[in-house]
Amino acid sequence: MKLKSKLLLSCLALSTVFVATTIANAPTHQIEVAQRGMI
């Protein structure tokens, strides 16, 4: 159980970092497309 929560937390952290870098590097229209893809 502990391993699963650690894995989940790592995945969450990775996706947060990925989204943050994408937003930092991408022009506005790409961000809008990414947000639509998440919904």
Curated annotation (Swiss-Prot):
Cellular component terms (Gene Ontology): cytoplasm; extracellular region
Keyword Transcription regulation: no
Gene null: resulting phenotype: Deletion of the gene results in decreased expression of genes activated by ComA, including rapA and the srfA operon. It significantly changes the expression of 72 operons.
Signal sequence bounds: none
Pfam families: PhrC_PhrF (PF11131)
Function: Signaling molecule involved in the regulation of genetic competence development. Secreted during production, but the mature peptide acts intracellularly, indicating that it needs to be imported into the cell to function. Stimulates expression of the genes controlled by ComA, a transcriptional factor that regulates the development of genetic competence. Acts by inhibiting RapF, which regulates the activity of ComA.
Protein name, as recorded: RapF inhibitor
Gene of this entry: phrF
